[in-house]
Amino acid sequence: MEKRISELDIPRTLEEACDPKHMALLIYDMQVGIVDQLPHGPEITRRVGNVLDAARDGGFPVFFSRHMSLPTELMGIFQIRQAMTWQQVDRIEDVKSPFPQGSAQWQIVPDLEPLPSEAVSDKIVMSAFEGTFLDFALRDQGIRSFAICGIATEVGIEPTVRQGADLGYVPVVIEDACGAGDEAAGERSLGVLRFAGDALFTDAATISALFYEATTST
């Protein structure tokens, strides 16, 4: 691990970033109403579940993001415009709140049910950091890097990775445990992140092995 003049550790490799004292797992929007929209949703759920099991076994902190939508009467400009686009309606009166708090589609899928020791952060925007407690909680835990997986790459994972990097974290994208609503758009998002140098990249099997390895090394 390289150091700068101030002796700040700079993780450069996946192994360096996966320090159990300084890494967390962030599971992005694995909700019933989102997973059900993707043909490969069950496969993404399985891979995310494997990573989650390994992180729990290795003692890594786990956070979930969960998208919620306000009642239509309280939606802002962004929420209304996005809902009109995604719901393919032309009139504001026809917009429906897609993920109201407490609804079936808002819930985390049962196979990934959070434990009492894990946190779920609700949000109304795409980045898991914007307007939530996530940054505060990670810093309180001494976290410097986070591994991210879930749905959808091109909608919320990319902005979460970019904002996380702007906040000083080292994001690790678990590529094959990230699902995209539009595969081409998802690949473009990964390409943008690679070009920017914001993140490290891995797959579910590799990072799961590192998580399990932390169990034997502690």
What are these regions (language model features)?
Residues 31, 68, 177:
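Short beta-to-alpha linker loops that shape the active-site pocket of alpha/beta-hydrolase fold enzymes
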